[in-house]
């Protein structure tokens, strides 16, 4: 599939054009499938597009109740005594997506999924990363930097994160057809 370059005037125009592209694809897929898996980026760039998509769904241009979404990101280390408090913290991507997209829909998605970052206790994670420096590697540069936990670890906590949180989320996406 060739790449198409689209030049827009400003953020609002970009948001409308992007929403039209996504809406067109959703309508096409919903004609053929019972439900659609939609991957969602998090951050300020897609917020205008999300508002246009919510408006289109609310106007009946596509059936949002047949969509299952998966977000790409979630923070770890947000304040809160438990996972629920961290997930609903105003700086969490879960909260952000409710404010910017999910909460705007009259007909809710079948299911919305944000990675389980709120389950990770940052203090324990930092302690385990220091204690087991050979169990993980740092990949990428700048804002794109991430930690990769190796397959075999001496740390039960790092092993749990890899198996239950990271791999568990990927398996859920695959099971949904994404």
Where does each model-flagged region fall?
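Glycine-rich beta-strand-to-loop/alpha-helix junction loops that act as flexible
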Residues: 40-45
């Amino acid at each position: 599939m060739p790449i198409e370059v689209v030049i827009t005037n400003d953020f609002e125009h970009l948001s409308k054009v992007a929403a039209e592209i996504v809406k067109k694809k959703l309508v096409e897929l919903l004609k053929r499938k019972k439900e659609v898996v939609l991957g969602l980026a998090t951050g300020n760039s897609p917020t205008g597009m999300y508002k246009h998509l919510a408006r289109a769904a609310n106007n009946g241009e596509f059936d949002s109740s047949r969509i299952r979404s998966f977000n790409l990101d979630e923070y770890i280390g947000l304040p809160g005594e438990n996972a629920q408090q961290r997930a609903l913290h105003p700086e969490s991507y879960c909260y952000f997506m409710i404010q910017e997209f999910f909460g705007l829909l009259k007909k809710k998605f079948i299911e919305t999924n944000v990675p389980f970052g709120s389950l990770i206790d940052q203090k324990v994670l930092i302690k385990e990363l220091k204690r087991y420096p050979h169990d993980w590697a740092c990949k990428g540069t700048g804002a794109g930097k991430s930690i990769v936990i190796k397959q075999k670890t001496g740390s039960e906590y790092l092993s749990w994160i890899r198996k239950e949180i990271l791999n568990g989320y990927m398996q859920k996406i695959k099971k949904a057809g994404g």
